[in-house]
């Protein structure tokens, strides 16, 4: 199922010549409900977003049951590559299905590794595993390979491959964030996971990126004033596994009960991906969005302006 959503304003010659300065309006995916965007730029030069899927009509987060991949080469025209995985394809997964929550993807030596949280038992909350599916393509033909042994039953996998080829995996939930090294096969831990130190008010949604030789761990906090919820925060370290120095908030709450995002550089511009409920007005029918992200000279992140 190929689907391209084009911003109507991009039809003018002026917008076309603006190139990367023009972006599709938010939310940039409007034909289905999406959340938890993990964005990566792969060797083909396109930017890919791996997202979870909210089922309409909403039934909370228990029925999130499949993953789609979206890609762009200009931040204006987006392609839906269709579904790459659902719970019925997970041999070790809970028989009732559902619970396919925020994913991530990594690339190493010709293979794409798709990481997803899924419970193995009817009693889902304490049986979370981080599953791995592999493909030779970034957005199709993924096959489940099992799950990573030795990780706590938490959610929100994030995999970061450093410049030297060493891969790190993170997961979290319930106010705890853990990280560790992966072996070269990308599906086994190299050693044990350890708690990430120095984070303030960590809730969930770990994301790692590197900028000017420093490592950034971003996440959602526990902010709740009754109307506004998760803010996006970040911390900086000289090492992928910390200790981390908390630097503050880079995104204020959206209109959604949750937030979950990623930070990526594409064609010389940094971007912040996140989700809101602008399309539906309902907490569990979310939509992925993106806005430009800027750094201060000292490496701190400026507050991201959420646009429509």
PLM ranges: what are they?
Residues 5-308:
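Carbohydrate-active catalytic/glycan-binding domains of CAZyme proteins
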Residues 1-3:
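Sec-dependent bacterial lipoprotein signal peptides
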């Amino acid at each position: 199922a190929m689907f391209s959503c084009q911003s109507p304003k991009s039809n003018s010659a002026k917008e076309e010549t603006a190139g990367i300065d023009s972006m599709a309006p938010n939310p940039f995916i409007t034909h289905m409900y999406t959340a938890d965007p993990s964005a990566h730029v792969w060797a083909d030069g396109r930017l890919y977003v791996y997202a979870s899927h909210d089922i309409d009509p909403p039934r909370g987060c228990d029925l999130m049951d499949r993953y789609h991949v979206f890609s762009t080469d200009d931040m204006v025209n987006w392609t839906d590559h269709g579904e790459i995985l659902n719970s019925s394809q997970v041999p070790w997964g809970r028989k009732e299905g559902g619970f396919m929550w925020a994913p991530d993807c990594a690339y190493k030596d010709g293979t794409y590794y798709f990481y997803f949280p899924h419970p193995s038992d009817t009693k889902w909350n304490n049986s979370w595993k981080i599953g791995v599916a592999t493909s030779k393509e970034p957005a199709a033909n993924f096959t489940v390979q099992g799950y990573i042994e030795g990780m706590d039953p938490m959610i929100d996998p994030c995999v970061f491959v450093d410049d030297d080829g060493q891969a790190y995996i993170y997961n979290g939930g319930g106010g705890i964030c853990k990280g560790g090294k992966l072996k070269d096969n990308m599906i086994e831990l190299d050693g044990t996971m350890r708690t990430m130190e120095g984070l303030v008010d960590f809730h969930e949604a770990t994301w790692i990126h590197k900028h000017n030789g420093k490592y950034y761990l971003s996440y959602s906090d526990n902010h709740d004033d009754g109307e506004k919820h998760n803010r996006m925060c970040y911390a900086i370290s000289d090492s992928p596994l910390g200790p981390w120095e908390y630097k503050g908030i880079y995104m204020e709450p959206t209109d959604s009960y949750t937030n979950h995002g990623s930070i990526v550089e594409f064609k010389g511009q940094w971007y912040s991906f996140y989700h809101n409920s602008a399309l539906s007005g309902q907490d569990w029918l979310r939509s992925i969005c993106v806005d430009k992200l800027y750094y201060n000279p000292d490496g701190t992140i400026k507050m991201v302006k959420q646009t429509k």
